[in-house]
Amino acid sequence: MSPQTETKASVGFKAGVKDYKLTYYTPDYETKDTDILAAFRVTPQPGVPPEEAGAAVAAESSTGTWTTVWTDGLTSLDRYKGRCYHIEPVPGEESQFIAYVAYPLDLFEEGSVTNMFTSIVGNVFGFKALRALRLEDLRIPNAYVKTFQGPPHGIQVERDKLNKYGRPLLGCTIKPKLGLSAKNYGRAVYECLRGGLDFTKDDENVNSQPFMRWRDRFLFCAEALFKAQEETGEIKGHYLNATAGTCEEMMKRAVFARELGVPIVMHDYLTGGFTANTTLAHYCRDNGLLLHIHRAMHAVIDRQKNHGMHFRVLAKALRMSGGDHIHAGTVVGKLEGEREITLGFVDLLRDDFVEKDRSRGIYFTQDWVSLPGVLPVASGGIHVWHMPALTEIFGDDSVLQFGGGTLGHPWGNAPGAVANRVALEACVQARNEGRDLAREGNEIIREASKWSPELAAACEIWKEIKFEFQAMDTL
């Protein structure tokens, strides 16, 4: 590049940033079974070669800094440095590349998602040599997986606790999410649970506000679920949100929930933080509480295609930090979620071993060793007409959560719950009989509505409701 054609970015790059590729770009490197592997979508500044950009990511997220320092001689750089070992162009994108980086396991504290993210994504995303950077996927080696407790209980233990098998679980978020008194809130919980739902839920921003303090909510919700249990003979739960301003306050709420004898609590793991989440997950395992996880704030991190972090990484991090449920999109509802990509990270949440499959956005084969699985939660803009698709897409090991799709029923909360339970049971029965839910779904719902007036009313009110927008999260 001649001086006349050099861009300002390239001049600034040469003047202020060390040439990283000599040390950190190692295309001949053979990855180790113990390495943490990362796939970054890199958009370099004009004038910055992709190899240099990838090497800069490896350096700044491991041992490197902008210049040579004398203390480099006091350690083994070869042992501790991150390495950019492969770069490939992103199809259809002129200036984007996937940079693969390998990190030695010794760079990370055992059992700490907080430390892992502080290293890999903590500083490098503000790097001037890059226009944008997105972490697409991580491969967590067996040796590191085994340092985490993971979910407090996992899918099979949860089913055994609830004595519920062979179908998805049904839930409902209480609406309006803010403004109800604790007693009215508890009444809404009771109506939904007695109507046939397995769970009701605090919304993510229900903590302890002036209109409803947490202790009052916990008491009224516990009363509601125990009353519903007595009437239905089924084990019921309400996700009591323990998220708080301090870890001490969060734990106080979790302890009170355990003393009440309820089966499950909840945490907003991104706004609450991974340290708090892991602390709560350990308490839940030790004290027999299930842990529901809400992903509030995730779209701030994962919505943009070229910058941030893909949700599949956040999902893996949650499985390591600990949670028995996590919201994972719906594919068919009001919130973001393309089918193949969503099913990719749903498998990463549930399965013990997941093969690399770029068609579903999975960059690395992931072996979870003995870490329990997490139930994906489908929630957001779904109603009875979506039940066949949800049952077919997510299968039995899932939680299908209908907020407005329960509470918006024209006859009230309990009939709304009845409608959802009837629709689910009809879909499960039809599937077990060999019927095609994708092709015959509407017919299955219509047949069931003939003997369930609650379902018929729900079908009528939501027959025209659709959320047809193009997904942002595409391959």
Curated annotation (Swiss-Prot):
Function: RuBisCO catalyzes two reactions: the carboxylation of D-ribulose 1,5-bisphosphate, the primary event in carbon dioxide fixation, as well as the oxidative fragmentation of the pentose substrate in the photorespiration process. Both reactions occur simultaneously and in competition at the same active site.
Modified residues (N6,N6,N6-trimethyllysine): K14
Subunit record text: Heterohexadecamer of 8 large chains and 8 small chains; disulfide-linked. The disulfide link is formed within the large subunit homodimers.
Gene3D superfamilies, per the entry: Ribulose bisphosphate carboxylase, large subunit, C-terminal domain (3.20.20.110), RuBisCO large subunit, N-terminal domain (3.30.70.150)
Primary location: plastid
EC number: 4.1.1.39
Residues that make up the propeptide removed upon maturation: 1-2
Naturally occurring in which organism (per UniProt): Lotus japonicus (Lotus corniculatus var. japonicus)
Lineage top rank: taxon: Eukaryota
GO terms for cellular component: chloroplast
InterPro entries reported in the protein's UniProt record: RuBisCO, RuBisCo_large_chain_AS, RuBisCO_lsu_C, RuBisCO_lsu_C_sf, RuBisCO_lsu_fd_N, RuBisCO_lsu_N_sf, RuBisCO_lsuI
Protein name listed in UniProt: Ribulose bisphosphate carboxylase large chain
Binding of substrate, residues: N123, T173, K177, R295, H327, S379
Modified residues (N6-carboxylysine): K201
Site (Transition state stabilizer): K334
Catalytic activity: 2 (2R)-3-phosphoglycerate + 2 H(+) = D-ribulose 1,5-bisphosphate + CO2 + H2O; D-ribulose 1,5-bisphosphate + O2 = 2-phosphoglycolate + (2R)-3-phosphoglycerate + 2 H(+)
